[in-house]
UniProtKB/Swiss-Prot annotation:
Its biological purpose: Required for accurate and efficient protein synthesis under certain stress conditions. May act as a fidelity factor of the translation reaction, by catalyzing a one-codon backward translocation of tRNAs on improperly translocated ribosomes. Back-translocation proceeds from a post-translocation (POST) complex to a pre-translocation (PRE) complex, thus giving elongation factor G a second chance to translocate the tRNAs correctly. Binds to ribosomes in a GTP-dependent manner.
Pfam families: EFG_C, GTP_EFTU, GTP_EFTU_D2, LepA_C
Coiled-coil intervals, chain numbering: none
Name of the protein in question: Elongation factor 4
A single GO cellular-component term on record: plasma membrane
Source organism: Staphylococcus aureus (strain MW2)
EC number: 3.6.5.n1
Catalysed transformations (reactions): GTP + H2O = GDP + phosphate + H(+)
UniProt superkingdom: Bacteria
Length: 607
């Protein structure tokens, strides 16, 4: 193909993604677009076609982004090439969304006709505007009995500033309005810029590991051309590889001769090491490199850390390999080795949020068959010590002694909640209970209020979202962003079993809540830890001071069962012997701690 043909082809390319709040029908709309462009044989069609992980189908959510090429014959007689990049909607996966948007020129904004605009919708709109994308608003689910398309149209105009007349009314389930959406994509989304004669610049926006072919990177070509046999260079690492295959996803992978300006496809270059094909990096040609890399996207830092330990210590190395493979297309995952007296060797792992943590844990157990114990999640604290030095703590067990610490800072987030009027009181009460600071309240219309609070991240990550949903009968939506670290009066609480500290059960708590949390936790552990042959004291301590204690009663074995009648001294001898045995057991006794006990640290607020 010569450059003239490439430029002509470029004019007919449209790259777009679909953004929406969770459950507003993104994946269903993607299915309909695939169906109506005849990209998928009817016999291969299934719901949530682009959600390729079993986990995504079971939970009904999108976790990974997916890119697919479609052909569309428009009413103007031209055939257009669409690249649809499906994105997740959950707040933990904002990073995936920002990666998808970096590869697009436009975005379909899907809003539920009954729910209207929600917190996540707005967050994604701001991301799209930051990337200078054209927005195509679609109101989905208009055939629902509770649908109010006119009200939602007004919301889109008032809150986002898009013209009502541009809004497409649709129902992805019933296949209404899909044709109009496809025509609008041609009209609204601009063709990609870029020069096929310039040095190659391609953005890696996703990558996955294939045990046979090595790393498969999803790329968006901005300038230049790439084909099999080219020698490419990664601009971040400077490493060079030979391209063995380039291709497109139709959702199946299909090799092609070349990828040129505006194309979205995949590239295989026998890259064996996960670190050599980092998401956000720029690929260029070794023989004619580009002068500077493309603007990547902002690196997301983990918000929540927890320890992952294999139940069987033999799996320690397998766990490392599993984490490395997951990290390949999940750049926000971080991990480093960690050892615990209670649990042996494992990894301290960083996540974007609790859903992200659950998903990774479940993927390791399913895809790699490694059984895990996870410790209670914790956020990152900054400690300024008396000698002026600074320490970062992401594991409560590593917190320095209280007398060495001058100040402790913890991360705060700005939380935006959209709630129906009736529940404002309940939501504000929840935020006060979570040490929140009221910032602002906005009545959007006569039904909904936008409430903004500053909250400690530690209070948000565990079960804030669940409690917010239950306090508002599921109507609230929620989005948060990190603002800064603030000084707090925090203490580390240790849990002692049988007089020994269990490092994996330590947690950091605000001094005002320390006594209640400690008392509630020891009571909870009493019910979760199996009874032993001897009595086990469970204590909560701050430094040397014990703030709460309870005992797990011993299992009584009746040593007198075989004594029928007989002398009292015989019975006493047996009881003394049992007592001595128990004392010895208590001295050397090892107590098995079940997984539920580690999670009990989180669930303290529910009591």
């Amino acid at each position: 193909m010569d450059n003239e043909q490439r430029l002509k082809r470029r004019e007919n390319i449209r790259n777009f993604s679909i953004i929406a709040h969770i459950d507003h029908g993104k994946s269903t709309l993607a299915d309909r677009i695939l169906e109506n462009t005849k990209s998928v044989e009817t016999r291969d069609m299934q719901d949530q076609l682009l959600d390729s992980m079993d986990l995504e189908r079971e939970r009904g959510i999108t976790i990974k982004l997916n890119a697919v090429r479609l052909k569309y014959e428009a009413k103007d007689g031209n055939t257009y090439t669409f690249h649809l990049i499906d994105t997740p909607g959950h707040v933990d996966f904002t990073y995936e969304v920002s990666r998808s948007l970096a590869a697009c020129e436009g975005a379909i904004l899907v809003v539920d006709a009954a729910q209207g605009i929600e917190a996540q919708t707005l967050a994604n709109v701001y991301l799209a505007l930051d990337n200078e994308l054209e927005l195509l608003p679609v109101i989905n689910k208009i055939d629902l009995p509770a649908a109010e398309p006119e009200r939602v149209k007004q919301e889109i105009e008032d809150m986002i500033g898009l013209d009502q007349d541009d809004v497409v009314l649709a129902s992805a389930k019933s296949n209404i309005g899909i044709e109009e959406i496809l025509e609008k994509i041609v009209e609204v989304v601009p063709a990609p810029d870029g020069d096929p004669e310039a040095p190659l610049k391609a953005l890696i926006f996703d990558s996955e590991y294939d045990p046979y072919r090595g790393v498969i990177s999803s790329i968006r070509i901005v300038d230049g051309v790439v084909k099999a046999g080219d020698k490419i260079r990664m601009m971040a690492t400077g490493k060079e590889f030979e391209v063995t295959e380039v291709g497109i996803n139709t959702p199946k992978q299909l090799p092609v001769d070349e990828l040129t300006v505006g194309d979205v496809g995949y590239i295989i270059a026998s890259i064996k090491n996960v670190d050599d094909s980092r998401v956000g990096d720029t690929i260029t040609l070794a023989s004619r490199p580009a002068s500077e890399p493309l603007q990547g996207y902002k690196k997301m830092n983990p918000m929540v850390y927890c320890g992952l330990f294999p139940i069987d210590n033999k799996n320690y190395n397998d766990l490392r390999e599993a984490l490395e493979k997951l990290q390949l297309n999940d750049a926000s995952l971080e991990f480093e080795p960690e050892s615990s007296q209670a649990l042996g060797f494992g990894y301290r792992t960083g996540f974007l949020g609790m859903l992200h943590m659950e998903i990774i844990q479940e993927r390791i157990e399913r895809e790699f068959g490694i059984e895990l114990i996870a410790t209670a999640p914790s956020v990152i604290y900054q400690c300024i010590l008396r000698d002026g030095s600074e320490v970062t703590v992401d594991n409560p067990a590593q917190m320095p002694d209280r007398d060495k610490i001058d100040k402790i800072f913890e991360p705060y987030v700005r939380a935006t909640m959209m709630v129906p009027n009736d529940y404002v009181g309940a939501v504000m009460e929840l935020c006060q209970r979570k040490r929140g600071q009221f910032i602002n309240m906005d009545y959007l219309d006569d039904i909904r209020v936008n409430i903004v609070y500053e909250l400690p991240l530690a209070e948000v990550v565990f079960d804030f979202f669940d409690q917010l949903k239950s306090n508002t009968k599921g109507y609230a939506s929620f989005d948060y962003e990190f603002i800064e670290n603030k000084e707090s009066n925090l203490v580390k609480m240790d849990i002692l079993l049988n007089g020994d500290k269990v490092d994996a059960l330590s947690f950091i708590v605000h001094r005002d809540f320390a006594y209640e949390r400690g008392k509630a936790l020891v009571e909870k552990l009493k019910t979760l830890i199996p009874r032993q042959q001897f009595e086990v004291p469970v204590q909560a301590a701050i430094g040397q001071k014990i703030v709460a204690r309870t005992n797990i009663k011993s299992m009584g074995k009746n040593v007198l069962a075989k004594c029928y009648g007989g002398d009292i001294s015989r019975k006493r001898k047996l009881l003394e012997k049992q007592k001595a045995g128990k004392a010895k057991m208590k001295a050397v006794g090892n107590i098995e701690i079940p997984q539920d006990a580690f999670l009990a640290v989180l669930k303290m607020d529910d009591e």
